[in-house]
Amino acid sequence: MYNVGIIGLGQIAYSIDNDPARKITWSHINAYKKSKNTQVSSICDIDETQVKKISQECDIYSGYTDYREMLKNEDLDIVSICTPINTHVQIIKDCIKHNVKAIFCEKTISYSLDDSSEIVELCKKNNVVLAVNHVRRWDDFNQKIKNIITQDNYGDIYT
C-alpha cells in the first residue's frame, strides 16, 4: 500500500467531483481512494478550515497547514501537488529532499523552462517519478486523435 499526501485542497484535490454533471472521477483524493494500492494518509492546505472539513469528509486523520511539517512527519510514497503554479518548484524540491518516491503535480511545473528542466533533472537524479497532470493527454478522445495523427494519414498538420 502506498501512502499518499495531498498538498493543496482546492477543487482539483477534492471538491470538483461534487458536481453531479461529472461522470468520471477528476479529483486526486477520490482517484486515490478508488485504487487498491493507495491510501491518502495526510492532507495539507494553508486554510485550516478546509483541512478539517476534508479530513472529516474523507476519514483522513492527518492534516496540516504547513506542507513542510507534513513531509517531515509523514512517511509518504506519493505526493500530489495541487497548489498554485508559483509554489510547485519549491514543493517538488522539498518532496525530493524528504525521499518521496513519486510526485503527481498539477500543470504546469513552473512558469520557467529553466526551473522545469531543473526539476526534471533533479527527479531523474534522485529516482523520483514525476508526472504532470495534463489530463487531456490520457483522455480517450485525445488518444484517438493522437493515433490518427501518428498514422500519418493526413500529411503535415499545422496549428
Spans of model-derived segments:
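Histidine-centered active-site/metal-ligand motif
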Residues: 28, 88, 134
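N-terminal Rossmann-like dinucleotide-binding module
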Residues: 1-58
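A contiguous active-site-proximal alpha/beta segment in oxidoreductase catalytic domains
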Residues: 109-159
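Short, well-ordered coil/turn segments that N-cap beta-strands
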Residues: 38, 101, 128-129
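Well-formed, non-transmembrane alpha-helical positions, independent of function
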Residues: 31-34, 53, 69, 94, ...
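Beta-loop-alpha module in the N-terminal Rossmann-like domain of NAD(P)-dependent dehydrogenases
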Residues: 58-122
